[in-house]
């Protein structure tokens, strides 16, 4: 079973990816892990990626695509299947993935798209506050400080401010939507309602994956 999981930041993609791996035994392939492994193992593409990262440059698509191809060509993938997480990030990378899978004789069976209203994500992602003295982290809605607290005792990181979060989500939507549209043409996208309990989201995902087996 070869799968791709997609969803906006805060949609619970990481949580659900871990559950899928545990339940179905597929290999979890996240971009960060892939890069770290390729660099640690000093593969051709890993060394190339390191040369860009060490200079503080962005790693070009062709190197990222090469690292993905190196990983997908390993034996455990053919045995167990994979769950791609965090790649492809752009439509160009999606086309490169299509070519890679064709070269390796692999097929993408399904795209799990966790669909969450972006406005609710702004609320979810911009609620984090940090106590100025202790550095303790809280969430205005999901994990507020005890009792009546004084907002002046807390601060927000720039990354967590609503306008920054909204910009980040807008970028993700602009990049992600063409990828979803691309795979929708093949009829392999399965939209999962993400505005429900974690366990309920996974029940829906499990049904989809079992239907593909």
Curated annotation (Swiss-Prot):
PROSITE patterns according to UniProt: ADENYLATE_KINASE (PS00113)
Region (NMP): 30-59
Principal cellular location given in the protein's record: cytoplasm
One Gene Ontology term, aspect cellular component: cytoplasm
Subcellular location: Cytoplasm
Annotated SUPFAM superfamilies: Microbial and mitochondrial ADK, insert 'zinc finger' domain, P-loop containing nucleoside triphosphate hydrolases
Region of interest called LID, as start-end residue ranges on this chain: 127-160
Keyword Kinase attributed: yes
Catalysed reactions, as listed in the record: AMP + ATP = 2 ADP
Domain description: Consists of three domains, a large central CORE domain and two small peripheral domains, NMPbind and LID, which undergo movements during catalysis. The LID domain closes over the site of phosphoryl transfer upon ATP binding. Assembling and dissambling the active center during each catalytic cycle provides an effective means to prevent ATP hydrolysis.
Family: Belongs to the adenylate kinase family.
Name the record gives this protein: Adenylate kinase
Species: Streptococcus uberis (strain ATCC BAA-854 / 0140J)
Taxonomic lineage: Bacteria, Bacillati, Bacillota, Bacilli, Lactobacillales
């Amino acid at each position: 079973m070869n799968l791709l999981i997609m969803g906006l930041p805060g949609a619970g993609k990481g949580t659900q990816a871990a559950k899928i791996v545990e339940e179905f035994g597929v290999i979890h392939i996240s971009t960060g892990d892939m890069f770290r492994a390729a660099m640690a193992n000093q593969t051709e593409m890993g060394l190339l990626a390191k040369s860009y990262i060490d200079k503080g440059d962005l790693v070009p698509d062709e190197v990222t695509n090469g690292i993905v191809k190196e990983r997908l060509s390993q034996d455990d993938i053919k045995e167990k299947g994979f769950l791609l997480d965090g790649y492809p990030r752009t439509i160009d990378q999606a086309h490169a993935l299509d070519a890679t899978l064709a070269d390796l004789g692999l097929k993408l069976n399904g795209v799990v798209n966790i669909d969450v209203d972006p406005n609710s994500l702004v609320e979810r992602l911009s609620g984090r506050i940090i106590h100025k003295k202790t550095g303790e982290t809280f969430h205005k809605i999901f994990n507020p400080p005890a009792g009546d607290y004084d907002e002046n005792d807390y601060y927000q990181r720039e990354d967590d401010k609503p306008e920054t979060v909204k910009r980040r989500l807008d970028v993700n939507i602009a990049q992600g939507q063409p990828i979803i549209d691309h795979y929708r043409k093949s009829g392999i996208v399965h939209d999962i309602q993400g505005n429900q309990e974690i366990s309920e989201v996974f029940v829906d995902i499990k049904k989809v994956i079992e239907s593909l087996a």
